[in-house]
Each structure stands twice: as C-alpha cells, then as structure tokens.
C-alpha cells in the first residue's frame, strides 16, 4: 500500500507569533497554553522524555529540549546569553520543530521566543491552581 503524504511544513516567524497573540489576546493565549499543559500532564507516561542537552560557554548556554509521543517528535532550541543586551539582542531566543514520528516529516518550524514567555506564564498559572487551597479565589 502506498503512503502518499504531502510534504508541507508551516513556518511561523516571530512576527507571525506576535500577530496571533495580538489577534487572540495575551490572556487567552496564556489560558490556552495552560489548558494544554494540564492535558499533557495527564498523559505524562505517553511521552518519550529525554534530558535536555546543554552547551555551556563563558557567554551563556544553548539548550536542546527533545520530546516525543507516539505521533509527534518535537524539540526546542533555546539560548540564554545575558550579555546580548550590549549588542541589542535578546538575552533569550528560541525556535522549535514539530515532526511526524512515522515519516519524520517536519510539520512546523516556529520561532518560539514569545511562545516560551507565554509558556512560562501558563506554567505559573498551572502551578498556582495545583497548589492553591480549595475554594481559593
């Protein structure tokens, strides 16, 4: 049987991500990411988790963070270079790839710097809900 799948990779630039956040709203984006994080925690055992790989230098760190489930493989590349501000660059920059496990076909290549900040806020919300006393407001 022939598996004729079309090769189609979506690319999201930093401007594309900003446009989505502006259109949907920052609060809605954080809430949506928090919801997805909570759903993924419920299926934690389904993930093939690998330790992040880090490359340290005197100027900063570059990390590669891979993860997969039965259908998708993903990684995030993120750096932390505190002195970048001297050159007008962000101290943290990130991008990532989402690929089909069966074929290795990249489905998404995305700039993730803003998404990383949103995920950090969403994770804080998830943790606050999990640790809050019952009936807390």
Label the predicted regions.
Residues 1-119, 123-125:
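N-terminal ligand-binding/catalytic initiation module
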Residues 121-137:
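Glycine-rich adenosine-cofactor-binding loop
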């Amino acid at each position: 049987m022939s598996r004729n799948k079309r090769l189609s990779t979506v690319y999201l630039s930093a401007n594309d991500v900003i446009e989505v956040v502006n259109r949907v709203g920052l609060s809605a984006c954080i809430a949506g990411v928090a919801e997805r994080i909570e759903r993924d925690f419920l299926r934690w055992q389904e993930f093939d988790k690998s330790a992040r790989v880090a490359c340290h230098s005197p100027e900063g760190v570059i990390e590669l963070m891979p993860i997969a489930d039965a259908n998708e493989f993903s990684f995030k590349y993120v750096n932390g270079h505190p002195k970048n501000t001297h050159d007008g660059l962000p101290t943290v920059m990130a991008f990532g790839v989402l690929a089909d496990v069966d074929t290795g076909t990249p489905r998404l290549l995305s700039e993730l710097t803003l998404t990383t900040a949103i995920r950090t806020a969403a994770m804080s919300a998830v943790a606050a809900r999990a640790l809050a006393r019952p009936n807390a407001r």
